[in-house]
Amino acid sequence: MSSDEYLQNNNALAVFCNLPTSAYVFNKNGNYFDLQHFINSPEMYESNLYKYMSSTNMLISAHYWDPKSPRLFAKKDIEKYNNLKVIGDITCDVNGSIPTTSRPSTIIDPYYYLDRTTLREVNQHDQALAVMAVDNLPSELPKDSSKEFG
């Protein structure tokens, strides 16, 4: 589904939306989004992912992140995103584009849980935010495939 359709989606069906970069960042000067300009000058952009967050239950981030690029959201905003239950940070850039990724998790223990107010790790409970940030996750797929499919 497109980013515009995602924002207008009001049904209870599970849907996914693969956001293009132009949907979640904007040029600070108000100029039209240009991918090459964003790659060369990421500091000239700000995130506007917030407009998607109230509709999002699970956020999966798998993009390259330059430290000069904006974070996708601010830690302090997590409390506002009540629908958000799980963040899967495939990139696992600690304190990077996903500011709730405070440490990597492991294949054996893939999730940790954060209190939405304090952002401290807590035991799992209904209001906690689950974070999956396995730093070697992309390398596990070939390993699993080799075991399962020989």
Feature names for model-found ranges:
Residues 78-83:
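Short, conserved loop/helix-junction motifs that constitute active-site signature segments
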Residues 65-73, 98-99:
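Glycine/threonine-rich flexible loop motifs
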Residues 1-68:
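Dinucleotide-binding/catalytic capping subdomain of oxidoreductase cores
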Residues 86, 91-150:
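Adenosine-phosphate binding glycine-rich loop
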Residues 58, 67, 85-86, 132:
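Feature representing long, continuous alpha-helical segments
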Residues 45, 52, 73-74, 149:
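General structural feature for long, well-ordered alpha-helical segments within catalytic domains
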Residues 73, 77, 105-107:
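Residue-level signature of transmembrane alpha-helix interfaces in integral membrane proteins
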Residues 18-29, 84-98:
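Charged, low-complexity, helix/coiled-coil-prone segments
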